[in-house]
Amino acid sequence: VRLVGSEMCIRDRSRGLKLLYIGDFDYDDADIESCHDAGVEDFLNAIYSARYVITNSFHATVFSTIFKKKFCSYAVSRTGTRVLDFLDDFNLQECRIDDLNRTDYSFNQKIDWDEISSIINRKKQGSLKYIRSIVNQDK
C-alpha cells in the first residue's frame, strides 16, 4: 500500500500532501512520516484529519467511511473478506485497490454520503431489532 500512497502523494505534492504511515515498518523516505506507537486516539485522529486515506486495514476502511473521507482500501489476505464485504455492503467498490502494482488510483470517485448514511441507519436498526429480540427472548 505504501507504493500506491507514495505515488499519490508525489502526484498531489502541489496540494501540499504528506504521507503518514501507521504501522510497524520503517521507511527510509523523507516523504513518509512513520508512526509506530499510534494509540486509538492517534489512529482515529489521523483518519479524521486526513484528506485521503489509503489503507489495508478493515478498521481504517470503516472509520474512513464514518468520517466521510475519500479512501482506497486494499484487501489483504487475513482481513480481506471483511474489507470486501464492507465495500460491497456500502456500494463502495470504487474504493477498492485490486492491484498494488498500479499507481494510477484516483480519489475522484463520487461517494454518495447520503446513501452511506441511509445504509448505516438501516444496519443500525436491524442490529437493534436483533438485540431486542435476544433480550426479550430471555424474559
Regions inferred by a protein language model and the residue ranges of each:
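Short, charged/polar "capping" segments at the starts of alpha-helices
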Residues: 6, 27-31, 79
